[in-house]
Each structure stands twice: as structure tokens, then as C-alpha cells.
UniProtKB/Swiss-Prot annotation:
Upper taxonomic lineage: Bacteria, Pseudomonadati, Spirochaetota, Spirochaetia, Leptospirales
Free-text function comment from the UniProt entry: DNA-dependent RNA polymerase catalyzes the transcription of DNA into RNA using the four ribonucleoside triphosphates as substrates.
Cellular component GO terms held in the UniProt record: DNA-directed RNA polymerase complex
EC identifiers of the protein: 2.7.7.6
Residues engaged in binding Zn(2+) 2: C778, C852, C859, C862
Binding residue positions for Zn(2+) 1: C60, C62, C75, C78
Protein encoded by which gene: rpoC
Stated name of the protein: DNA-directed RNA polymerase subunit beta'
Amino acid sequence: MRSHNDFESITIRLASPERIKEWSYGEVKKPETINYRTLKPEKDGLFCEKIFGTTKDWECYCGKFKSIRYKGVICDKCGVEVTHSKVRRERMGHIELAAPVSHIWYYRSVPSRMGLLLDMTVNQLKSVLYFEKYVIIDPADSGRSRGELIDEEEYHGYLDEYGDKFVAGIGADAIKELLARIDVDAEARMIRQKIQDKDKISDKRILKRLEVLEAFRDSGNRPEWMVLDIVPVIPPELRPMVQLEGGRFATSDLNDLYRRVINRNNRLKRLLALKAPEIIVRNEKRMLQEAVDALFDNSRRKRAVKGKGNRPLKSISDMLKGKQGRFRQNLLGKRVDYSGRSVIVVGPELKYHEMGLPKKMALELFKPFIMKRLVDLDLAPNIKSAKKKVEAEDKEVFDVLEYVVKEHPVMLNRAPTLHRLGIQAFLPVLVEGKAIKLHPLVCHAFNADFDGDQMAIHVPLTPKAQLETWMLMLSPHNILNPANGHPICGPTQDIVLGIYYLTSELPSEPGAPLKSFSNLDEVHYAIDRGVVEFRTKISVYHQGKILETTPGRLIFNTILPEGYAYVNRPLSDKETNRIIADVYDKYGPAKTVLMLDDIKKLGYRYATLFVPTISIEDIRVSPGKVGLVGDANKEVEKADSEYRKGIITNEERRKKVIEIWTKTNDLITESMFKELEKDKGGFNPVFIMAASGARGSKQQIRQLAGMRGLMAKPSGEIIELAIRSNFREGLSVLEFFISTHGARKGLADTALKTADAGYLTRRLVDISQDVIISEDDCGTEESISLGIVKEGENVIVSLNDRVFGRYTAEDVIDPVTDKVVYPRNTLITREVGQKVENLGYDKIRVRSPLTCESKQGVCIRCYGMDMARLIPAEIGEAVGTIAAQSIGQPGTQLTMRTFHIGGAASAKVQEKEHKVSYTGIVNNINGRLITNEKSQSVFSRRGSIVIQRLIQQYKTEELSNLRVENGQKVDKGELVATSPSGENITSAMPGAVHIENGIFRILGEEAVIPVKTGTVVNVKVNDITQPNQPLAEFDPYNEVGISEIDGTVQWMDLEIGKNVRRDEDLRTSNILLKVIEQRREKLNPRIAVISGGSREEYSVPVDAIISVQDGDKVKAGDILFKIPTVAEKTRDITGGLPRVDELFEARRPKDATTLAETDGKIEISGEIVKEKRVLYIHPDNPDQEKVKVTIPIGKQIRVRNGDFVKRGDQIDDGNLDPHDILRVKGVTALQVYLVQEVQEVYRLQGVHINDKHIEVVVRQMLRKVLITDSGDTSFVNQQQIDRLMFNEENKRVIAEGGSPAESVPILLGLTKASLNTESFFSAASFQETTKVLTDAAIKGKTDNLMGLKENVIIGHMIPAGTGTKKYKDISVFKSAYGDLDRPLEEEEEEEIPQSIADDSDGDE
């Protein structure tokens, strides 16, 4: 017999009336439920036993047949079949309607499917369905057309005129008739023809209509099935009625809704039988329509049907929707048996793979195993008495418990489970008490602490489940973080402190002789005798050489694996983690886990031994603080007076003040740390806690002993009154009051943002859940380029880190010898990466999930290494879910950050000048420079300074025997020449040789420094610059507009009172002229400078502050207007999480920048159309037409008349719109942009996420293409299609000799993409349940159950990991005999050969 679970796919369609009758076991005729006296179901009612089956097992309604003997007999008296009462969960009934009614899903949803088929609007449909207007079905010769609406009078007029030939109807009857008359095929053909005749169809409705028509054509559904003649009644057990104490009944809302339908239907039947007047019948029909609407979807209606207490009743649709609906509550999240939960306490004596299980819990969790064992050992005659024994907690029960629990892994879970490390398996160790004991090093993965956290415990029951738990989920298999491959098991807090103390070194007297020892035992002896301290410097003979070290470090090195290089430095948490990662890399997980337990022991032991304690005396305030605060006060006073004199604006003053305090705070922090470091010989406990990474940060100690600094308002704005005190000195009342902002913001943020991050994770999981590793190699030729990530000059991510765990997409060639070092498809390990770096590469091409061409999921080569185990991913790995967790989990963590700093603001100090940290040579200065009155060179437009690193420089006559030639690349340490004295000259860094005018230079790479308008340049081309020499100076607070010629100012379209506001500052009586938005008139604000025959015009954007009056004389280089840059807000993930959200949802930014669509020359026309300026780009190629660009008047334009732009350049200010990047620059540019921007946010928070996780999500966002020309394919224009389906269909059409479809890639945000998945189950359980199901039913969609979610919903094993199709057919046998899957009874029936019976000692 096939099990009902053995199916590959599920199809959803509209049900025909015949189909509904087939399902039904009888008609429900009465609205009654149960008899109030006998409490038995009423016959023909909603709970009727004749229709839905018996309520008592093997017993009919009247009691004539009572026992399993009569199985299948139908009682002649009451008509009830003798069977299981379970059938009441599956047998359906039906209600025969006296008049057809329309299904609310199909006429009320947007877009209305019925409306599209009939070409009517929802309101027109409603007026017909609710009996307000007639619709013409057959117009005869009236000159009207089918589907038109007419009112009562017209109807009667036409009837009198044309008699029976004219047919019009009202109500669902008429709609049904119209639907039945639609010839879906012909209509679809007609529309396709129409589309082909026209070039561009502007009416989207036509395309939508075509889609619906073709859906009906292809799915075999009939349009008239959207109107119901029969309503199915769902089984009574699914809408139960239960008796409460006190004799009242609680019933499901569905019963009330069904009752209304039946009542109205029966009343309508009677009215029709009595031939009642039309108006009464119509009213009843309308009420029936409303009753059925309410039954199917009560929340869709304007006035929902209310039950007791004015609560809207829950209809069938509401049962499916939302977090409490069927999908999310019962199908995707079920409660699990064999589980318990309790508070956790720390278990420092446990091994890494163990957890302490309270005996009380173990007794309950392992009950069935204990009972079986008791019976097996003949300690109990049968299961029943064994159960009694367990409940009585007899002595032998506890002896058995030890045996049962041994080597039976259990799973621990801490909510919220943000990533897969939130559930791990351990071996239980029985403990007294009621609390679960947890190993301290796994806390980080669970994000657990011992302040009252609770954890849940689950017991895997079957041998297969235990095996899987053992092999995959045991904690030693999970010591790396899947997000980045770093250890997640590193020590924290006390352990770190203990290790740091143990490995640190006391400052010794200079020149004092060191004590010497010959081996470790001697050192131990000396410590025990008190001759040396753990941290004294000693010299010792170790592994064949003499070491200068400390006894503590010797002790620490004993726990490292044999052969590991001696660690001779103080170990902070970062250092310890580095060692763990290194040991994992070199020795594998087994050795690492052993070492972890030793580290834990050492850490706790020495933290106890050194007893670091904190007292208020340890918080040392730096004596230099008073002076620094005094200086700051003076500077603030100076800024104030400048403002009062009118030299600077209020906004500039504010920014200056904030900068002064930020800088002062940094200086105080520095001097405070120096103070702390000197205190107690470098062992000040507060300092050590921060230095070792055990607790606290620079930020927190700064607030304790420095100054609290600037605080942020809830809006993120910075309050310019700095808090000058610290917590050691205590805050003044005002300071305390300002502080309250931050404290409250922290708490509010935590609450709100956690929900946001959780929702982000949910959307990420939803979009990427069906990305599973499906094959070894998809064979694609595509790849992406990955390189070093820099911020200014600093390398933030090295090449090795960036490409680690990928496969190379091209051969890696040694640039010197031209030999292939690593062929294509080499896995990049740490060594390979290091070697590639040493070859001088700064970027290479690698395989990526973005370019993978697998039909389902991605392939191993494109994905690369599984970051949690550092080996290539395996087929069946659910990499999509891992990616979603890796991105979502830090989001949730980071939102909690504000909480700890207490709202102290962090603003960056604004740079005023451009400089580089090395010696350089100025290669080029791009841009237009003018000399101003002070004879400084000023950039009058945006430009750039190109500077190249100068590594070495010699005069050629100082060198003899040159080994290199001009332009040649050299590596670090490569011999380039010898000096006349015969010394070898080698290159200090990789670079290129440059010989010119008798000077030999080795130059590094070029750096291009972009500069803004108004920047003053201090260098010339070919200047040699010193490290940190200011190359150029600029105004950090304003963008400026600069005159390029001497002349007279003329205001154009600038009028005070219209688009210029005259602000007078009351405090200083300075006057500011500010440009504001002007809607009514078409003004194009500009400032012109006129000099003789020439004139230059400058567009003035909104918010600009005008610095010159009409008629003023100006010199070249003078400032015409300033645009204040936006005040810095604090940058924390609060800014970050919405940013990530915005990127993944692919939202268009508010003021998106305009990108140049082509290369060419700018022409600013001066035209204004609809409050937008018009620009033209003239392409280089004269055959191409000029491209028109429109820009809102208020925005600042980045280009000037006659400038050249490249395709994709920004023309005005604003944020980049990802959709524009896709359109203008293409898919690759967009992928790079999205990955970079998301990484930027996380990097700012110090969170490491491997690029590949973000790439997996971006791949899913770019799955669809938009059809622009359907060719001979079955697609419709403007339809969104999966890229793979698009390619398949095109292949098919080309093979048949047709013309393929054309498309453009589109970017879908998370929510849109999730709702557009191929699987309707997955989409329905995500959001907009009814809409998804409506759509799927009409299209007759088939869900092939490819993703994880669909399979969880229908109760299959997920097609990932051990459930992958590839592994389905593998069967496991126990000692080559008997199948593990087979039920036990079968096994007992077979004669087991003696030899096997002997060695199978209960290993099941």
C-alpha cells in the first residue's frame, strides 16, 4: 500500500460543483448543531452523524450496532456507518444553494479576477451581484453590447421593445451566465493579436487580462466555477463544539457562519416555493451572497459579521492568515513532545560536549526508555508496572536511568534561535537540583548568560535521529561560526582575565639578572616555594633552546597541542581566539576541543588565584583633564564670538562646537588610558579588564574616568552641551538630565529594533530557503572579481580574507615566471591565499553564487567552502538558510548595542584637509583650477588629485649595475641594483620601476583623491610630498559654488520673498539669504557673473545660502553661494539596520540621484518642464540621438555645461537607486554595489560576514526578468518570469525556429521576491495568504516541493542534508541484518540467527 505521504507535488485548482459533490457525504439541511437535552448531534444538522460519521468509535447513533465486529455496517435505523470516530476529521458535507453566489476571493481581491475576465470593474461587479443593476447577456438588436450595465427602468423598456430576444440578468446568476459564455481560447488569441499590432501597450489591464485568460486556458479551470451553486461544509472536528463547565458551549466561529448560510438558504427556498414577490426574493438572495462572503472571508467585507461581544467572527480565510493562522501556527511551528525547559546555571566542570541534566527531568524525558529497560532486566513484569515504578521513583529506577542516559545525546535550544548554533546537541550528565548545567564556552553561540536565562531540551528518539544528532549537531562539531568561519567557542570574561594574568609579564628592573631553570618541574617547584612569581621574567631550557619567558606562559604552553610554536606574549581575548583558529586549521577539531577545555580550566583557576578586584580608587582620573576641558571651553567661546561677528553661520558654529568636544574627549581618553596603564605597574584591574577584552570597552572606561562627552537626542541629533564630568566625579543636575535621553533611547531602541531585526531575518529566510547545494559543478564560465577592501589608505580586508574559501575562476599565474601556479577551480585555503597575495595580486577572479547556473540551488564550485567546517560544501547543504541566518543574526545582536554605551554620541571628527600617510609623488591634478586673490589655486569644479606612493628614490649616477628596466614590476626584497660601493639595493615593497630625467624611483600604487569644489590645492604635479603633509584644504561643513571669472554678479530668477528667504539672526543681527522651494512659478534660480562679453551661469539649488548681492563685483575664486552639508547624526546600527532593510527591499531612495544613460557631453538647456531642469547629453557618436535628462530644480547639479560624462556617472546629488544602477550599469555593477553597501553597515559595527552569504541573497533578488518582447514564446509582455524558465522557453522556441523573447533583468526586494516564488505554499505561508492562493488556484499551479518550507508544511522530510533526494534510496542495515526502519513487531516474528542475537546487545 502506498503511504499517503509518498507524493512528489501538490496541485491547487478551482473545484467544480461536481467535485464538491464527490467530496461530500451528504447534504446539511438544518442549521442545528446538537440537541441541548441529549447533547447528541441533530440529524441533517451541522454535526450530523449520518453525514460526517459516528462520534463514538464502532457505534452507531441509535445504539443498534455496538462493537468493532460490525465494522463498515450501515445501520438501517439511523443510517450511520459503524466506524472510527476519526472519520469526523476528514468527511465533508455540502449545502445546495437555492441561488448561485459568487466567491468573494475572485471578485473582491485586487486585481479582481472575475472583473478581468468580464472586463468589468469591482464596483460594476458588485452592483450586479448585490442586485442594484442589470447586466446585458444578449443585447438582441438594442444596439447595446454584452456586459453593459442598465438600471431597472431601462431593462423593462428593452424587454417591452424586444421581447424574449433581449436577455439581461441580475445577481450571481447573470454573472455565471456571462462567465460560462466566455471562450477563453478565442479571447486570448484576440488580445495577443492586438498586442502584436500595437508596438507598445500602455494599458497594463490588457496584459493582466491576457494573463488571467491564459491561466484559465492552461489550467483547465472553467470561469463559471468562480460562482458557486454548492458550498462545501468542512468536517465537524475541524470546527469543534466543546462543553465548558457550567453547561455552556464553546463553538468555532465557522459554525455560526455556516448557520447563517443555511438559515438564509432555507428561507430563500421557502420564498421561492411560495412564489414570493421578486423584491423580497432579491433581498434574500443578496443576504445569502453576504452570508457566503462572510463564511469564506469575513475580514474582506466592509462591515464584518460580529459575534458575541462585538468581535468579528473568524472566517475560513482568517484561519489561514497571519502568525496565528494555520500555516505559521500549526504547520511551520509545532509543539514538540519529549521536551522540557529549565533555568541554566554554569557548569565549569563539564567537558565541551556535556551538559548537566537534572535527574527529575531525565526521569520524565527518558520515561519510555527506562520502562523498556526495566522490563528487559525483569525488574518489572510488564510496561504498566514499570510505569508505576518510574512514577514512584524506586531505587532501581535511578540505576537504570544512568544506563539509559549514557551516550544518548540530547538537544539544547535557547530562544530566540537566531542561527543554527542556537540548537546544539550534548551528552547528558545527571546532576542533582533542578537547573540545567551548561558549559561556559558554548554560551557565546547560544548568546546565553546565567542571569536567569532558560533553555529547552529535546530528546531525539529513533536510532536514526540519534545518529544524526551525534554526527552533525554535537557541540564539538560546531565550534566555528557559519557566518565567517571564526571560532565562536572562544573564552570570555573570567577565563580571559585568568589567561591574561597568567601570560602577562611584570616589569623587571633593567639589567637585573634573570633566574634560570632547566625544566618545567623546577619552575613549578620554584613557584610553590614562592621563589618566583607567575609573571616574573625567567630564562628556561625548553625544547632544546634557552627561552626568555615567564612561568605563567610556560604553564599556558603545556595545554597547546604538541608541535605548536611556543606562544610568548600576553594573551587577550583576540589573541586567544587567533590561537584557537590556528590550532583548528593545523590540527583539526578534535584537538581544538581538548585544548578548549584546558583553556577553560586554566582561565578559571588563575582568575581565582590572582583575584583581581575593583574599587573606586582604581578608576583614575587623568590630572591633565582640567586643562583640556579649559582649552575646549576657550575654543567654544571663540567659535561663539566668530558667529556673533557674522564670520560663520549658526550651523557652522554648531558643527565646530561638536567637533571641539569630540576632539577633546579623544584627548582626555588618551591621557586617561596612559594614566591607567602606569597605575599599579600596568596591573590596574579596570585597565586590565579592558585590555584583556574580558569586560568593558574604551568607550565605557572613558565614561568612568574621562568625560561622558556628547549625548544624542532621541532623534539622533547631537546635543552640543557636552557632559564634562565622568561617573567617578559624578554628574551635575543638568548633566544628569541630559543623560536621561540616552538611557531611555537605549531601552526603547532595544525593544523596537529587535522586532525589526527578527522580521528582516524572517524575510531573508523566506527568500533564500530553497537555495540548496544541488550539484558538484554547474560548468559556468562566469565569475566575479574580488580584491582588497580599503578605506582611504588602510586595508580593512586583505585579499586572503576576502577570497578565502572560494574556487578560482581563472588560472593564477606567477607574474615573474609566467607559470600557472594554481589552475582554474582550485579551492583557496589560507596557504593558497597567502601565496596569491605574495605574488603581488590585489584582486583575482573567483567563482560565486551570483554567477552560478545551477537550475535548482547552487553548485559546490560556485559556493565554495562551508564556513562552519572549512571544507568544501556538500550536496544537500541548506546554504540559503545559513546565509539568511548569518545576515539576520548580527542584526538582532547589534540593535542591542546602544543599550550598553548609554546613548553617548559618537561623531567623526571632520577632516579639513586631504593628506596621505606616506611619502608620495603627485602624478596629476584633474579638474579646473583658478588662482584667487590670495594667489591660491582653487578647484572651481569637482576634480581629483592623483598621488603615487614613493617607495625609494635614487639618482641614477648613484647606482651601478641596474637589474631592472623602466616600467618593470618588482616584488618586496627583489634586487634592483647595486651601489658603487657594492651594496645590494632591494625593493622595500612591491611596486613598479620608474626612471626619468636621471632619477630612479620605485613607485607603489596610485591613489585617486576626489576633491570638491572650492578646495585649495597646496601641491603641484611632480611634487614629492611628505607623510601627512596637507595636499589640499577644504571647508568640511559646506559645499560651495565658485566664480570662474572676474566680473559683476547678476541674480537670475532669484527674488527675495519668492524663492529667497531673508533670515535675520536675532542674537547677532546677521542677515542670511537662503534659497527655498517655490512651487507656483517656474523659476530657475541662477547666479550669473558677467565680464565684458563673457558670462558664466551657476545653478543655485534649494537650501543654498547666497554670499553675493545682485550687482556685486567678484574675483575669480570667490564664493558665490554655500550649501551646508547635513549635520552628522550618530552612526550606529540604528542607522544601519534600516539601511540593510532598505537595500534588501530594493526601495527607491527619496531623493535618488540621476545617472548618465550614455557617454557624452553635457548641454544645460535652461528649459524648465514640470518644475524640472532639462539637460541633454550629446553622445560622442554623431549617429546617436541626444539623451534628455530632467532634474528637480531644488537639487544641486554636479556637472557644468560642456563637461564630459561617462555612462553611469552621477549628474546631480542624492543617493543611488539600485534599480537605476541595474538599468544603466548592468547586473554586475548592481551585485557589487549591494554586497558592498550591506558589508559597509556591518563592518562599521565590527561584524564579520562572509561575502558569499550576502551574494546568495542578492542572487535570489535577481532571479526574475521582465519580458519586453514576447516573440513567439508563451509569455506576455511586462510579465515577470524566472530567469531559468525564460532561458528554457527561449531554447525551445529557437529549436522550433521561432523568434525568442527579449527581457531585461529586474531587481525584486525581499518581500516581493518571496511572494513571487515558484512555490505557492512557501509564498502563502509568508504574507498575503489569500491573494497567493487565489492566484495559484486560477493558474492551476503545481508545487513541486523543492524548497524547505513547502516540505515542512506538508510534513515531509526537508530536501536538504540527509533528506536530499540523492540520499533517499540508501537503506541502513544493522550488522548486515534487519532494516533499521522496519517496525519491531516484524523483527520479532522472524527467527533471528543465534550468532546475531548474541552480539546485538541492545544497541538499538
